[in-house]
């Protein structure tokens, strides 16, 4: 029955025309509702709310599951979810406003704007703090399931103390050489904003973002959320949901965590950015360009926004607590058109990646626009389909109608394999990695990923044999 349902969903998914602001494709709402139900069954999602918009028009918003499984209270589009690190998007936007006004230079040392930074941080640019390429240490550790700053029974009592704790830690790497996601980076940005405005961070964010945009359901800290609307966070353990029981963050940490919000408020925020209501769109488009790392490659953060470039689109956004994600996608310029996708959950039994969830909405909402998202969803269906005709059908679709450029397909399948391994287990991902070696038998990377998957399953002999094959393929020809 599951496969029949999944097959029907996939047929609808791939037949759907792209949504447009002039008219909704027939059945889009029912297709997205079906996808939400599929995701809930597939990953054991407690509760979820999803919004899809194009050029300012909301094409779909819906919810399913329970905002509080303990009381069986249903999730609704007005439920308030713990968005955690999506708080960084507000902080980044506040800094970008100062850049837009010519008051902050991202390539100047943050010490120009913040006094008393640790000596080792004096030359670190604002951009590196935004993009997690600063190399600084963290201001807390996880000790017995609690946040603890060194020298304190819990987290440091205030912002200055927290910065001193982080400053006492050794530099983790040369600034600008690589990326390490570190909350202390956003303490520096919080200090920068509070120094400039001479106000506490929450007051700045309310005055410059929340109040002008009427984001009345957005706040910080679970204690700020009405119990009748709170989506209680859960995590997966041994395939079962259990309460997350997350520690609250101190208010000085609200620039990086503890955001509480709804799909509607996040849509208002992203729409305002896309239309120049918070800062000029030409400034945004410059700031959402990749940072080159001295250690090689590009940073996947652009002024603090998680950034990918796929299907001709620049896609920016952020995860929150691994449970939620917001994404804004535009092709070329924001003026040429944009999409907004917001996918909020309060947890899943399989701890599904938020990127996997938001891409499932992209695959259904605009399949012709986002073929990489369609590929991801199709591969997930293949990994779960044990029928004999699953592989020939998958290969036929990949050959004839997948929409991903040939030169990008191997890498895309490999990346999707890892996402499937994380959310559904190595056993399901094995099918995808095996398929990739069949499609690209001369790829050392494809065989290496397959070997790694066998190793994760405890199949050491098979893993060693495949690692050897990958190594042989990687050797340059004499």
Residue spans for each PLM region:
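Catalytic loop of the DD-peptidase/beta-lactamase superfamily, centered on the K-T-G motif
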Residues: 22-62, 194-199, 203-207, 211, ...
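Active-site-proximal loop and beta-strand segments within enzyme catalytic domains
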Residues: 26, 42, 46, 66-182, ...
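Alpha-helical scaffold elements that line and support the substrate/ligand-binding pocket
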Residues: 50-57, 82-105, 109, 129, ...
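Catalytic-site signature segments of enzymes, centered on catalytic residues
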Residues: 63, 78, 141-144, 149-227, ...
